[in-house]
């Protein structure tokens, strides 16, 4: 039986990634040990793990995740209020497949898309 999934994304700088996800997106760090080259963050029921990839070229990074959420309008506004740059092709909108979505690129150009089912 599958119970959870925790995506692992590349990061060039643990400090930069930590600060972005905590200060801009409202995540918090968890775990009792600071693992060299590895970062674990959590918000609500979502965990995202990051592994160090110092030579990553952000323009060549195709890391991406899709996060289902509730109250997407409020989440979108919080991102705007926190100065998060929304992806140019990813402003909040209803998609033909029945999801209300928005997307952003983190400092390493991992594409993070948030979506909520619309009735």
Predicted regions and their residues:
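N-terminal beta-strand motif that seeds the catalytic metal site of vicinal oxygen chelate
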Residues: 1-16, 65
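Vicinal oxygen chelate
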Residues: 12-14, 65-111
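Amphipathic alpha-helical segments
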Residues: 15-28
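Short secondary-structure junctions
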Residues: 26-32, 86-89
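Conserved short beta-strand elements that form part of the metal-binding/catalytic scaffold
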Residues: 28-63, 111-116
